[in-house]
Amino acid sequence: SSERYVIPGGKLWKRKCYANLRFPVGKIHEDQYITYKAFFDCNRVVTVDVSLYFYWVNPNGITKKGFSLQRYDNIEALTEARAFYLNNDKNDLAAKADSMRELFIAMYSIYAREYHIYADVDMQYKMSRMKAGRIIKNQLGYDSWEWHMNKCFPIYIKLHSYLKKICSFFGK
C-alpha cells in the first residue's frame, strides 16, 4: 500500500523538520498533533517497504492503560489536521483525516461503553452502536469488525461465529 501511518516512530527525521513544532502539553496521542505538519514542510519523503522498527511495549504506556476520555485527544488532533489540510488546499488529505476521525469516533464509542464512561463522552463524539459497527466494517473489513463488535455484543458475535462455522461446514 502507498499509504503510511504519519506517526514519528519508525521514521528518521532531519532536525529542521521539527524545528518550529512542539508537542502539546497534557495530551496523549501528542504526535498526532504535529507529525502531519512536519511531513507537509518536507521537500522529499522516502519510504522503504522493510520492517526496520521494532515497537517497544511500555507496560505503563497509554496502550496498556484502560480506555479513558483522554483518548479523545486523538480525535481532536485529527480535527485539527483536517482544518490544516483544508487551509492548505489539500482536500484529499482533509477527506482522509475526516475518514480516520469518523473511524476513531466509531471505535471509541464502543470502547467508552465497554469501560462504562459513555455517559461522560462529549455529545459530538457519541455514535450509535449500529452506526459504529457499519463504519468499522466498511473501513477496516470483516475480521476487524467482528473483533470490535465482540466488545459491544459478545453474545451476538458468538452466535454469529457459530452460524458462520455451521454454514461453512455445510458448504453454504
Segments predicted by a language model, with ranges:
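Catalytic core of nucleotide-sugar-dependent glycosyltransferases
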Residues: 52-58, 65-91, 110-139
